[in-house]
Amino acid sequence: MNKPVTTIAPGCRDTPILKQRGQREVFCGLTGIIWLHRKMQDAFFLVVGSRTCAHLLQSAAGVMIFAEPRFGTAILEEKDLAGLADAQDEIDREVERLLSRRPDIKQLFLVGSCPSEVIKLDLGRAAERLTRKFAPHVRVLNYSGSGIETTFTQGEDACLESMVPVLPETEARELLLVGALPDVVEDQALGLLDKMGIGPVRVLPAPRADGTPGVGPNTVYAVLQPFLGETCSALDRRGARRIDAPFPFGEEGTTLWLRAIAREFGVSDETFEAVTAAPRARARKAIAAAAETLRDKSIFFFPDSQLEIPLARFLTRECGMAAIEVGAPYIHKGLVGPDLDLLAAGPTLSEGQDVDMQLDRCRAARPDLTVCGLGLANPLEAEGLTTKWAIELVFTPVHFYEQAGDLAGLFARPIRRREKLRLEVAE
């Protein structure tokens, strides 16, 4: 088996982190419903919020109302906000109407929003009451998608965390993959693990309620997304044990992630090499094509999705880029520690957001590529900076070997576009 790539320069695990608590510019956790409702095929997400919440979901999902999507919004009217109506009774009526019309729903999530949190609406009590009423056909859970103190990927974390306490108990030794991935990417991961003889493998979230995984003291789990800190804590409380590894972005990250699982399950070096050699070679070849554009280019990450640290590791080590600043909404060293170990010392690490101060640092650095939110991209482009929308990195399949070239290409394309525009202007 090929040995892991070693870092000559010291890593960033012990690098001082610049803490920022100023003005923020991010989407709220409701955004996670866009990919969760596609993954969980018999679940429904009922947001208790305002018309703004409804417009966000409708426009972001690109789903027509008549398509019967698996999400909706119970609108809080002025009388609800003023306390002139019993919001709990209103929720009961809406849920009863929904379930009578949609008997295919097996899991119902009551999702809190900024308005429901401001008026202290107890959705946990509503979920318990409604579960008693509609059990065993429907389980009702709740979580918050509010953007008051969170960023948009934390919606998935809150959703999965709400599921962990009600997962069935099991004594079986099983591998649990934690995090929502597109089906085609998840199938690739399961296929590689199956070829190594690793199993049984379960997934959280499961596509259907009847496939919900169990959890117990013999459960080991591997995390697919770096923003699932609270879900990991909930699994730890249930007795499960996490497999520590870098996240599976790029050839190196995917190999180290799979290697950690293989070692846990006693897979031989020969078997591991036989299973991974071909996809690793394809990944390296695909990355190399994009790396020609990215090599020796500088990059600046605004905090947005919590993917920033693993992506910076991938871009600096596999694509030859230089990171100036790597900002993340939250830095969970328990999860991204292995990626920090591989990220060579040098870039500023910042946690949280003070958007004006970060804009000043970005303008002073003049990076070749800036990864930021939608609201910052156009103004920075107007100032002559090349940008990449951070949210695209969440909605695009980017995990594991077969997507490694696509991941590198996402960063190469805006640089190529800028270079082409400069050539056209020069002509």
Curated annotation (Swiss-Prot):
Catalytic activity: chlorophyllide a + oxidized 2[4Fe-4S]-[ferredoxin] + 2 ADP + 2 phosphate = protochlorophyllide a + reduced 2[4Fe-4S]-[ferredoxin] + 2 ATP + 2 H2O
Family statement drawn from the similarity comment of this UniProt entry: Belongs to the BchN/ChlN family.
Biological processes per GO annotation: light-independent bacteriochlorophyll biosynthetic process; photosynthesis, dark reaction
Coiled-coil blocks: none
Binding site for [4Fe-4S] cluster: 28, 53, 114
Protein role: Component of the dark-operative protochlorophyllide reductase (DPOR) that uses Mg-ATP and reduced ferredoxin to reduce ring D of protochlorophyllide (Pchlide) to form chlorophyllide a (Chlide). This reaction is light-independent. The NB-protein (BchN-BchB) is the catalytic component of the complex.
Keywords: 4Fe-4S, ATP-binding, Bacteriochlorophyll biosynthesis, Chlorophyll biosynthesis, Iron, Iron-sulfur, Metal-binding, Nucleotide-binding, Oxidoreductase, Photosynthesis
One Pfam short name: Oxidored_nitro
Database matches in SUPFAM superfamilies: Helical backbone' metal receptor (SSF53807)
Entry GO MF terms: 4 iron, 4 sulfur cluster binding; ATP binding; metal ion binding; oxidoreductase activity, acting on iron-sulfur proteins as donors; oxidoreductase activity, acting on the CH-CH group of donors, iron-sulfur protein as acceptor
The UniProt record lists the keyword tRNA processing: no
Subunit text: Protochlorophyllide reductase is composed of three subunits; BchL, BchN and BchB. Forms a heterotetramer of two BchB and two BchN subunits.
Keyword Amino-acid biosynthesis: no
Annotated protein name in UniProt: Light-independent protochlorophyllide reductase subunit N
Pathway(s) per entry: Porphyrin-containing compound metabolism; bacteriochlorophyll biosynthesis (light-independent)
E.C. designation(s): 1.3.7.7
Names of the cofactor(s): [4Fe-4S] cluster
Cofactor binding, per record: Binds 1 [4Fe-4S] cluster per heterodimer. The cluster is bound at the heterodimer interface by residues from both subunits.
HAMAP family: ChlN_BchN
